[in-house]
């Protein structure tokens, strides 16, 4: 909004001219989302506590230390969604189609997550909305987004870029739509599975969003994309502002979500954040890089899949003491804070590996 209002005056005012730069607006987005989180956090937490008598249901078969979390409210992802969307509406170019497509997906996945959290709180169990129903809704939203990109996007939308290789792209044809849906839905659920400890998912999400802030900026810049031999996709630079807002809102949320958490982001936050990262990776044609940068989410998801299939194949045996993987280490006696910090370190390593693919070709 501010960008569009100030655009006619960029040549007459130094202040207005600053808004012409994506980097300035991105930095401002971080400041705004952080500030909004600090201001609205206590109010939202108090409101959620008044509505949720028992807070988020805690699994009885989980680590014993988790019973101390009883009564902690969920749906804190509302804070992240509101602050990120407000900063994007204020600072991004509202004539940019990618801005609106991404916001649509972000909010839609947030609504699905809210429905799931609401079902858990009202039923007082950790099951919520049926898994198949959630997958169906996620698939429908992802399909709509892919169709919008297919008909509104003039970029090479069927190409899958392979990182670390020069000019290597696979043309998936119309199968790319199926692949893109898988990326978006998979990303959404992978983040959801990772969000099991205080602050565990928040920092890796911030690292991933920060990485895609850089990727969006480079892909949307003709000079930088040519220099790095990336597929140039005009106008994706505006997604940098949204990604920066995600970084700020996640860091602001971490203030209240650090152990011991005052609030959980819930599926409202995890499904929406995972979904929006998947959408941005599809738009920027860096789907495989998302799997690298978000390697922690991939590992957590793989641990669940392996556990389930091995359990069925062996009729009751398990690979891990408990899945997802972070619970396995808790069962081994690791303190929650140790698991969280070590997983943060792993996520930093994955982010650096993913970003190195931009240059190593």
Curated annotation (Swiss-Prot):
Record InterPro entries: Glycosyl_transferase_4, PNAcMuramoyl-5peptid_Trfase, PNAcMuramoyl-5peptid_Trfase_CS
Location (main, coarse): membrane
Superkingdom to which the source organism belongs? Bacteria
EC no. given is: 2.7.8.13
One annotated GO biological process: regulation of cell shape
Q: Which UniProt keywords apply?
A: Cell cycle, Cell division, Cell inner membrane, Cell membrane, Cell shape, Cell wall biogenesis/degradation, Magnesium, Membrane, Metal-binding, Peptidoglycan synthesis, Transferase, Transmembrane, Transmembrane helix
**Localization (cell):** Cell inner membrane
- What cofactor requirement does the entry state? Mg(2+)
> What is its pathway?
Cell wall biogenesis; peptidoglycan biosynthesis
Transmembrane segments in this chain: where? Answer: 28-48, 74-94, 99-119, 133-153, 168-188, 203-223, 236-256, 263-283, 288-308, 338-358
Function noted in UniProt? Catalyzes the initial step of the lipid cycle reactions in the biosynthesis of the cell wall peptidoglycan: transfers peptidoglycan precursor phospho-MurNAc-pentapeptide from UDP-MurNAc-pentapeptide onto the lipid carrier undecaprenyl phosphate, yielding undecaprenyl-pyrophosphoryl-MurNAc-pentapeptide, known as lipid I.
Q: NCBIfam families, from UniProt?
A: mraY
- Family assignment from sequence similarity: Belongs to the glycosyltransferase 4 family. MraY subfamily.
Q: What is this protein called?
A: Phospho-N-acetylmuramoyl-pentapeptide-transferase
Naturally occurring in which organism (per UniProt): Rickettsia massiliae (strain Mtu5)
């Amino acid at each position: 909004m501010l960008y569009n209002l100030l655009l006619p005056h960029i040549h007459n005012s130094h202040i207005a001219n600053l808004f012409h730069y994506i980097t300035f607006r991105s930095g401002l987005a971080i400041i705004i989302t952080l500030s909004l989180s600090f201001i609205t956090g206590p109010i939202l937490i108090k409101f959620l506590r008044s509505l949720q008598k028992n807070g988020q249901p805690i699994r009885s078969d989980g680590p014993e230390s988790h019973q101390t979390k009883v009564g902690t409210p969920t749906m804190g992802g509302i804070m992240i969604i509101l602050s990120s969307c407000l900063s994007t509406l204020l600072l991004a170019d509202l004539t940019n189609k990618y801005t609106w497509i991404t916001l649509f997906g972000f909010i839609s996945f947030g609504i699905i997550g809210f429905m799931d959290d609401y079902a858990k709180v009202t039923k007082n169990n950790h099951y919520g909305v049926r898994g198949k129903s959630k997958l169906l809704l996620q698939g429908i939203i992802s399909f709509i987004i892919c169709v919008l990109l297919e008909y509104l996007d003039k970029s090479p939308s069927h190409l899958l870029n392979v990182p670390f290789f020069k000019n290597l792209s696979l043309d998936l044809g119309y199968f790319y739509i199926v692949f893109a849906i898988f990326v978006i839905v998979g990303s959404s659920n992978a983040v959801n599975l990772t969000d099991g400890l205080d602050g565990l998912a928040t920092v890796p999400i911030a690292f991933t969003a920060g990485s895609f802030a850089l990727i969006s900026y480079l892909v949307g810049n003709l000079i930088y994309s040519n220099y790095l031999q990336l597929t140039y996709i005009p106008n994706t630079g505006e997604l940098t502002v949204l990604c920066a807002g995600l970084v700020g809102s996640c860091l602001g949320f971490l203030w209240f979500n650090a152990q011991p958490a005052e609030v959980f982001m819930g599926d409202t936050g995890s499904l929406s954040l995972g979904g929006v990262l998947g959408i941005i990776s599809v738009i920027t044609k860096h789907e495989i890089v998302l799997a690298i940068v978000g390697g922690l989410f991939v590992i957590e998801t793989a641990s669940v899949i392996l556990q389930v299939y091995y359990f069925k194949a062996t009729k009751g045996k398990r690979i891990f003491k408990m899945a997802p993987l972070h619970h396995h280490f808790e069962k081994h006696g690791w303190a929650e804070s140790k698991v969280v910090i070590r997983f943060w370190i792993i996520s930093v390593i994955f982010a650096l590996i993913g970003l190195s693919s931009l240059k190593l070709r």
